[in-house]
Amino acid sequence: MIKEHSFGIIPLRQNQGVWEVFLVQHQKGHWACPKGHPEKNETGLETAKRELFEETGLSVTRLISQIPIVEQYQFTKEGVVVDKTCTYYIAEVSGKEKLQKKEVKNGLWLTLEKAKAVVTFQEGQTVLEKVSKVIDK
């Protein structure tokens, strides 16, 4: 078993008083929030901000919560079990969407409710439910 850790931003904006989240469709077809692996000497938050900008062209305006949401799951890759941890920071973002075509096929702004129906994996739905609880406080 190998362990993997990714960091991402849950990119939010307000549109006419309603929170929306930006989801990306990866080249392999699944929908999720942007995330990636750290580079040398990078903190988790630095990784998350860099990956957000690289994949979407968006930048963090402010963190909505200082407490990240952690998602854990396992999958098999080339016959090896991967124990994956994803740490997400909830943030309000700004900028013009510019997708990194090498990794990202598509991107959409959706209400949190609609996004829960679009994300591919159950873990992603759980993460968005936690986001809803944080922003509804």
How would you describe each model-predicted region?
Residues 90-92, 97-130:
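NUDIX/MutT-family hydrolases
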